[in-house]
Amino acid sequence: MAYPELDAADFLQQLARRKEFKSLISPPVDQKKLIHDLRSHFVQIGGPGCEKGGRAFFPCDPYASPFPSIKGLQLHNAQLFVQNFQNPNTPYSRLLLNWQTGTGKSIAAIAIARQFMNHYMNFIENAPWIFVVGFTRAIIQTEMLRRPELGFVSYKEVAELHRLLHIAKQSGSTTSVESRHLNGFVSTLKRRLTDRNRGGFFQFYGYKEFASKLFNITSKGEEKNFDVLSLFHRSDEAEDTLNENDISQFVQKISEAESNGLIRVNQKIMEQLRGGLLIADEIHNVYNIQERNNYGIALQYVLDAFPPHQAPRAVFMSATPVTGSVMEYVDLLNLLVPRHELPNGQPLQRQQLFDNSGHSVKWKKDALALVERLSTGRVSFLLDTNTNYYPERIFAGKMLSYRNEMLPYLHFIECPMSDYQLETLKQLGPDPKISSNAYSIYDMVFPNPKFSKQTEPKAYGLFNSTETPAALSMASTDWLLENGVQIIEPSRRTPFNVSGSFLSLQPPTHISGLAFYSGKYTQMMKDILSIIRQGRGKILIYHNRVRMSGVLILQEILQSNGILNEVSSPVGTTRCSICAAIRDDHTTHSDHQFIPARFTILHSEIEPAVRERSLALFNASSNLEGHQLRILIGSKVIVEGLNFQAVRYEMIMSLPLDIPRLIQVFGRVVRKNSHMELPPNERNVTIYLYVSTTPDGGPELAKYAQKLKEYILIQEGDKALRKHAIDGFTNQIKIDKPMLESLPLSPSITPANVGATVLNTFEAYGYGEQEVKTISNIIISLFMARPVWTYSELWKAVSTPKLIQGITIDNKLFSEDNFALALVSLCYSKNQCKELCIQNRLCTIMHVPAKPEHLYIAAVLNYKKEPVLDIETYIRDFQPPTMHSIRITKYLEHSQTKEPFQVLYEKFQKDFQDEPMEQVLIHYPASFHYTMLEALIIDNLAGMGALVEVYKKFFIAFSKKDIQPFPDIFKIISHVPGDDDTLVGYATEDSVRLITSRQDKTWHEIPLYMLNINVKRKENDIVIGYMESKGKTLKFKIRPPIQVLKKNEITDIRMLNRGAVCETRGREEQQKIADQLGISLNLTKISAIKLCLLIRNTLLQKEMEARNQPNGMQDGIRWFYLFNDKMPSLVHTS
């Protein structure tokens, strides 16, 4: 076979020599030297000082980046490696992606799947399927549908998806029409992935769903309470060992259970998986000892049930493949290694690897060597700490010891328990064992109704989750008031919880506050206020639990100390998100406007759609500094699959189930490019790990000590697992000292000893064609940076490593033949010419007399993408112009003879010194008003109070006071400086534009209906007025109300009355309209022009009155359409 077998003695060496893998060794490059060499020898691109060096045919841009870049998604080297390793052309059946969080495992899995999909498309019939199984399958689908480079959607579809998503978010409702349109579009795209008739090859399942669909319990099985786990059980749960006969004969036992009518295996799924691909994300969830389930059994069955040559290929993913217990290595290896390649062709047993005879588990002699051997060629390991892409991780606090032994790796914020907590802890006796329903004592205790005053001697608190709710619910009203406790009654979606001043740092004098009940949460609250005072930065607070002392009480603590949820209105005690001062004391601060500090919360009892919306608001670029949402509180639902952007502080209030899951929590906020929008000095995350302590250490510190001890054993297994990682020589991960993510580790092969390059598989399996495409992209980016090249300069630039941002492969291994082929495809044609040739669509080839080389010059293209030929070609913009369609009629009506704003503004200042200001609405076009509104909002133009009042009377402009009744909207502009009367937005015909930053001139658009503006208000029964632009003038036009038009039966579309200039209507019609409008004047002596002015002004006055009635913008009668009103379409439909 072309590729080496896994059992070959020099497997990794043979693999590393192949060009498709060797080229992924990213060579070290001194960037300063690279820039110097480039400018001195062959290329002048951009950056400071570029004009002083290098040869060029055009002026350089000293403010440009010194390196060109390729736009769009570019797979990084680790992703390219596994794509090349696990594909239909290689014999390798199973692979574990052991990559740290945030490094792109999902993209890598999709890239692998795409190779198999391309292969399956060649099948005439019975093409296999690609199964994506895991709790995060929705995230993988999202990646597939937002990355056109992956080949599942077009750029146009992605643009449409973003448009619909933006509109749906603005609607503020998951059930709105806009949201339904978005969901329909997404469903259409998703069906393309899963519907074979539409070219789909994917099936997506959650672990539970996959297991339940694979194993269908029959009615007979249900009668006998049959459980699949009974066929795959641990023979001694106390010892946690497996019965060898049970595990080795599992497939046979499933067949027997099926024969006995207890179970029915889903044969459709089995046939779809035959020869297919199985992708399982967060694989550690399927065999976790602490959470018993049948997920792993289902995966093990589909991998073992087929003959080896028909079994599905498999890709497993996890940053922490072993979590709950080191003995999970047995389950992992049984999934990762095909049955026939395990020792003696039988599944591994725990007693083969571990000694469990004493009080602790130990690795057996030679067990780690066996792990090394079995994992060779089956593991990809990536640990990326490059500070160019990842934020720096900073631990607050200090290292602690427990029973004279220093705890490794972690720094803690030590929180001594309060006296009341200590007294409560005594109730559990010496060296207490904390049960699962008593975990609250790690964090806090609750007031106890058994004692009238909590300060009396020997008083102790409540902490047990089965006793506390009942005891507090039965407490008297007087006791609750006396102790500052408020009961939050449970509902269908809201569990029992408490609030009140006992959670405050500064309670009333007669009430014991937060410091009395919790040392940990008191320290947390003090740290939060300190962080806010220090400056900007978002905060993530994690707690593993929801109820009792979990995230629900954390939200009450924040609210009791002046931090609001997403929708509450500020009060006197609300804290400022910039300085942490309460609102009542904020008048003394002159350097910034009061912005209420807010938080949001994510936990399992909140609907997914609501969680997604809150996460989107927290991650939004407009919330980069945390001024809209400063804090997010999350339970264990955030541990996997969610990404948080630009978080500066992470507060961990409780240990997850184990240390590997703690690493996952760290990874939520330390992710690739997660902080790129922040200034370089703010690209860091400070982690606060809070622990409650007692004078002798305490039960929570003891829990950390035990879990860290277990984790050291897991780390030993991790080191063995990664020892012979397939990509160790390319990822070049060298760890010199123990760290949280890994013990010391060196790759078994280094770049220096890879050996000579082997080309046979590179050329045989299409990698040469891919190289041509890569070179073509590089050439295009070089031409976009500089329009004139010689052949030798261009080849040197293409073959220089790391010259192009986003390309990290070893360009020195590029073939010049492939470069020439790429250049031919971009520039040459069959035609020959002597002096000037323009071919194809990228570059011009010019022969310069007395020069040894042709010049390659970027072509200028017309809208048809045909080259334009003239002597200035080489200095023109390389980008082809965009072709736009223009509606001539609309252009003539709205575009020609427009007067500039400055001219109209001067005219306005002159004409409206004495005239009624309302008339400005009908004398100036929409463009003037929109420019004026933005000037009023951004620049606060002086002397415009009367105009502002007109805009506000007609609900065209909005102040902060106008937005305050809408809490969800107000938070968008609450941080904008100014008092309640400050203008912050204006209405257009489609939306309301709200200012988010005057300095940056950034706006946020929301639908009109979110401010109770109804664009389809009922028209009056008399006449409708509006202004229409005719060149430089505006004409007053009238038409019958739309309900009258709909009643008339018109057989000739030319007779449809769409409106006419008022002066052109007959005198009789004008007088009739005036009478109906109540214009009581002697109309016989009034000219048609003056009569129309009276009608116009009357309609405008009635429109203002209608809008100012209660709920007028929703239900008021329509009389006049202003410049920002959308006219209904008048179309003949008969």
UniProtKB/Swiss-Prot annotation:
ATP binds at residues 99-106. InterPro entries: Helicase_C-like, P-loop_NTPase. GO terms for molecular function: ATP binding; ATP hydrolysis activity; RNA helicase activity. It is found in: Virion. A motif (DEAH box) lies at residues 281-284. It catalyses: ATP + H2O = ADP + phosphate + H(+). SUPFAM superfamilies: P-loop containing nucleoside triphosphate hydrolases. Residues 524-725 form the Helicase C-terminal domain. Residues 52-352 form the Helicase ATP-binding domain. It holds the Pfam family Helicase_C. GO terms for cellular component: virion component. It is an enzyme of class 3 (hydrolase). Disulfide bonds: none annotated. Keywords: ATP-binding, Helicase, Hydrolase, Late protein, Nucleotide-binding, Transcription, Transcription regulation, Virion. Induction: Expressed in the late phase of the viral replicative cycle. Its main location: virion. Transmembrane segments: none annotated. Its EC number is 3.6.4.13. Belongs to the DEAD box helicase family. DEAH subfamily. Putative initation factor. This is Early transcription factor large subunit homolog. It comes from African swine fever virus (isolate Pig/Kenya/KEN-50/1950). The lineage of its organism: Viruses, Varidnaviria, Bamfordvirae, Nucleocytoviricota, Pokkesviricetes.
